[in-house]
From Swiss-Prot:
It is found in: Cytoplasm. Pathway: tRNA modification; 5-methoxycarbonylmethyl-2-thiouridine-tRNA biosynthesis. Keywords: Cytoplasm, Isopeptide bond, tRNA processing, Ubl conjugation pathway. Acts as a sulfur carrier required for 2-thiolation of mcm(5)S(2)U at tRNA wobble positions of cytosolic tRNA(Lys), tRNA(Glu) and tRNA(Gln). Serves as sulfur donor in tRNA 2-thiolation reaction by being thiocarboxylated (-COSH) at its C-terminus by MOCS3. The sulfur is then transferred to tRNA to form 2-thiolation of mcm(5)S(2)U. Also acts as a ubiquitin-like protein (UBL) that is covalently conjugated via an isopeptide bond to lysine residues of target proteins. This is Ubiquitin-related modifier 1 homolog 1. SUPFAM superfamilies: MoaD/ThiS. The gene is URM1-1. C-terminal thiocarboxylation occurs in 2 steps, it is first acyl-adenylated (-COAMP) via the hesA/moeB/thiF part of the MOCS3 homolog, then thiocarboxylated (-COSH) via the rhodanese domain of the MOCS3 homolog.
Length: 101
């Protein structure tokens, strides 16, 4: 499954300072594309893209409070959060809304 993942608001620093990642994600064994959800994607991101301080991006199985998640420009809170189904060629954006001052 081909996806575009974008990180902003400082989260790109956790991914070798790259903001945009075009990735190929393998489906879990026995899963079809209708079964691939944000929960699976977040696990994949933690394992394959986050290079340092994963606790700044995730808390448990989900993103930390203060991280805005958009799936194809739609807030994931409107589409089921962890249960949001991810499809081929989707664009998923993670933006930290927490800033120092």
């Amino acid at each position: 499954m081909q996806l575009t993942l974008e990180f902003g608001g400082g989260l790109e620093l956790l991914c070798d300072s790259e903001k945009i990642h075009k990735v190929n994600v393998d489906l879990p064994n026995g899963a079809d594309s209708d079964d691939f959800t944000m929960k699976h994607l977040l696990s994949w991101v933690r394992t394959n893209l986050i290079k340092e301080r994963p606790e700044m991006f995730m808390k448990g199985d989900t993103v930390r409070p203060g991280v805005l998640v958009l799936v194809n420009d739609c807030d994931w809170e409107l589409s089921g959060q962890l249960d949001t189904v991810i499809e081929d060629k989707d664009v998923v954006v993670f933006i930290s809304t927490l800033h120092g001052g």
